[in-house]
């Protein structure tokens, strides 16, 4: 197995360490899913395995989700909708197989867990996360024209309640480990060097663990169901906010709401198939492929200088000028100053220029920026009404 390393200890706990060769971050690939499927078969059939801990061998994080570049064949509906469903259902079914393998499974989350990476962790019975404030956990698929398609729309609402889950799902927001603990998305926080040990301790103490939604009498936090007034009102509001943001011109948000609404009223196995049904419809439409290409694939290529002319050395600017201190000009000035660049902020008079700098000060204060850092950033912004102050600028921008 090239993407999963196996290590069984004396207590019979199998540690699966995800470590994709040649990748800076773990992502879900066909090789990974094949390795995970083989591992699940071993877990089910080997009586010597008493439980499982899933973790990452990457210092960069746990897992960042699906390899979007490798999903190109799915986009645009090249085959039948049934064929697309069968393909997208495979990952959902695989995570469900892990969840129902008959052994306790814990995730030791050592870093970033996004998209399918978080969905994998949610399919584990227990989640221990590193307490580092730099870690982000989330399902950001909606930001690139998709939505979570490996159980995220069903497990997250069952953990934290429908209304708070929709806030994260529809906006693609990430949460900190502390927020995740408060929402019961993770069960425990520990230092990075202790998460595997804590996960193993839980596995040993819970030999017959099952997911909450597989227990008799499970109920959604906050309630769910078509006859629950609060449940219905939640979707009325969510639909209105989606319409305001997209004019219902985007497929993914509507499909996401439908998957959550329908799935919340069904047993988990049926709900997961509903999710895959809507996910297949989204990826079969050309819109999803176009958005992934523009917002992810092409963006990454541009950031790496894919079209940069050969033989021209980089010229990082040391001093730039903004012609106009309005919201956009002041915003660009703030970002540049935070990057260590001096900014001449020019407007028709000093009052207007100073107002632009004051906007930056207000933004930094609202973000609770460290006072010393705030002073450094503001010190790089030079308001003026004199065009002579543009002398020596490497770049002049008119927003």
State where each predicted segment sits.
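Amphipathic alpha-helical segments at domain termini/boundaries
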Residues: 1-19, 122, 163, 170-278, ...
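Conserved CoA-thioester-binding segment of acyl-CoA-metabolizing enzymes
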Residues: 1-55, 93-96
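Hydrophobic/aromatic residues within transmembrane alpha-helices
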Residues: 54, 67, 120-121, 180, ...
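Phosphate-binding active sites in nucleotide-utilizing proteins
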Residues: 313-398
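Hydrophobic, secondary-structure "cap" segments at the distal end of domains
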Residues: 152-163
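Glycine-rich beta-to-alpha active-site loop
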Residues: 92, 96-144, 148, 324-332
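Glycine- (often His-adjacent) and acidic-residue-rich active-site loop
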Residues: 56-93, 113, 143-145
């Amino acid at each position: 197995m090239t993407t999963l390393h196996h290590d069984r200890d004396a207590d019979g706990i199998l540690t699966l360490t995800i470590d994709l060769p040649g990748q800076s971050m773990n992502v879900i690939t066909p090789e990974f899913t094949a390795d995970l499927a083989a591992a699940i078969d071993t877990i089910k059939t080997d009586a010597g395995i008493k439980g499982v801990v899933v973790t990452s061998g990457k210092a960069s994080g746990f897992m960042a989700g699906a390899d979007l570049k490798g999903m190109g064949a799915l986009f645009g509906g090249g085959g039948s909708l049934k064929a697309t469903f069968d393909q997208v259902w495979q990952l959902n079914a695989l995570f469900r197989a892990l969840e129902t393998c008959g052994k306790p499974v814990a995730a030791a989350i050592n870093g970033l867990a996004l998209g399918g990476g978080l969905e994998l962790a949610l399919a584990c019975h227990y989640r221990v996360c590193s307490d580092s404030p730099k870690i982000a956990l989330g399902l950001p698929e909606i930001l690139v024209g998709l939505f979570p398609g490996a159980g995220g729309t069903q497990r997250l609402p069952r953990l934290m309640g429908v209304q708070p889950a929709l806030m994260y799902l529809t906006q693609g927001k990430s949460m900190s480990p502390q927020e995740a603990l408060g929402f019961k998305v993770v069960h425990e926080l520990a230092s990075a060097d202790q998460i595997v040990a804590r996960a193993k301790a839980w596995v040993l103490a819970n030999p017959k663990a099952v997911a909450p939604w597989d227990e008799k009498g499970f109920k959604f936090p906050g309630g769910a169901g078509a006859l629950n007034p609060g449940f219905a009102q939640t979707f009325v509001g969510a639909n209105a906010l989606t319409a305001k943001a997209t004019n219902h011109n985007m497929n993914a948000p509507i499909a996401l709401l439908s998957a959550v609404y329908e799935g919340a009223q069904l047993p988990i196995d049926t709900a997961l198939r509903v999710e895959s049904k809507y996910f297949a419809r989204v990826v079969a439409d050309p819109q999803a492929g176009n958005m992934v290409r523009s917002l992810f694939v092409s963006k990454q290529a541009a950031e790496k200088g894919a079209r940069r002319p050969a033989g021209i050395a980089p010229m990082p600017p040391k001093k730039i000028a903004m012609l106009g201190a309005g919201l956009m000009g002041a915003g660009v000035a703030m970002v540049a100053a935070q990057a260590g660049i001096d900014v001449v902020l020019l407007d028709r008079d000093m009052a207007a220029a100073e107002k632009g700098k004051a906007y930056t000060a207000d933004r930094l204060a609202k973000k609770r920026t460290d006072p010393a850092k705030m002073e450094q950033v503001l010190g790089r912004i030079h308001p003026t009404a004199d065009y002579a102050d543009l002398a020596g600028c490497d770049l002049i921008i008119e927003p």
